[in-house]
Amino acid sequence: MTADTSLRPADHPAVKSGKVGVLLVNLGTPDGTDYTSMRRYLREFLTDRRVIEWSPWKWYPILFGVVLNTRPRKVGKAYELIWNKEKNESYLRTYTRNQSELMAEHLKDLATVKVDWAMRYGTPSIASRIEALKQEGCDRIVLFPLYPQYAAATTATVNDKAFQKLLSMRWQPALRTVPDYHDDETYIEALATSVEKHLATLDWKPEMLLASFHGIPMSYFKQGDPYYCQCQKTGRLLRERLGLTKENFMVTFQSRFGPEEWLQPYTDKTVEKLAQDGVKRIAVINPGFVSDCLETLEEIAEQAAHSFHENGGEKFAHIPCLNDGEDGMTVLEKVVRRELQGWI
């Protein structure tokens, strides 16, 4: 719906309105693998109070005194292993841009809808893309944090950043935030199909399928974060859809950081133990990641595979994320069309 301009004064400034924006938001990515780019990205990420809930008086001396002086080089080297050399960017940026472009194509029947993308950390920022959508005439925006399972350290911090931008705007767009979809049947079916398709390309059958989710500190869970429960439900629904038993399917948690206890069982320890216990063939899927990134391509496909082989395992397969494939886009489109109801 477009505003009636016939009643405007002759000197009224041109104003665009009547559009609906869809903003896809993922975690973030450094602009490069060099020390400066990595430090800038890690500083923004690790100063987020949703990510590290310690008091700044306790955390900042460690962060600025140690972590930001040593970790950028280490993480930069890891990114170099999985960097998209063709586009000179991380694959997370590549896939998120592709998802945005494909979503726009899928929604071309909705003439008033504009689709864009942003990153919580790094560029393009959430604030810049909300501003761009507003300038394009979007007086309503669907904000889509690309996380199937809700966590304060992921979904909530995306929402926080969007709300922070709105605080600075005189003419705020209406904002609708997308909830989690951890038990959506289309999402579960897409995960199951990706497992079946990938395993069909192998000449061996895994004895164990791990569903590895990003971890969070146990203290966050105990304070009421629903993430653990949602991961477990996703895992159970996927196991049931694949017809597997608890003896050949496990939910595990990866990417722990710092001295705190995190959600368990830990993926890295589980992979080691499986190999040490005589399991020779395993496959790993990352249901909580919409797109492949450092945590899947390097931590699982490289580090976990190496650990499994070093401890006696023989066959290891990493099942790619849904990324910008047809099944993955079907999931995202379903969620977006559902959340657009009443606005189009």
Curated annotation (Swiss-Prot):
Pathway: Porphyrin-containing compound metabolism; protoheme biosynthesis; protoheme from protoporphyrin-IX: step 1/1. It is found in: Cytoplasm. The keyword NAD does not apply. It comes from Rhizobium leguminosarum bv. trifolii (strain WSM2304). CDD domains: Ferrochelatase_C (cd00419), Ferrochelatase_N (cd03411). InterPro entries: Ferrochelatase, Ferrochelatase_AS, Ferrochelatase_C, Ferrochelatase_N. The gene is hemH. The lineage of its organism: Bacteria, Pseudomonadati, Pseudomonadota, Alphaproteobacteria, Hyphomicrobiales. GO terms for molecular function: ferrochelatase activity; metal ion binding. This is Ferrochelatase. Its EC number is 4.98.1.1. It comes from the Bacteria. Pfam families: Ferrochelatase. HAMAP family: Ferrochelatase. Keywords: Cytoplasm, Heme biosynthesis, Iron, Lyase, Metal-binding, Porphyrin biosynthesis. Its main location: cytoplasm. The keyword Lyase applies. PANTHER family: FERROCHELATASE, FERROCHELATASE, MITOCHONDRIAL. Fe cation binds at residues 214, 295. GO terms for cellular component: cytoplasm.
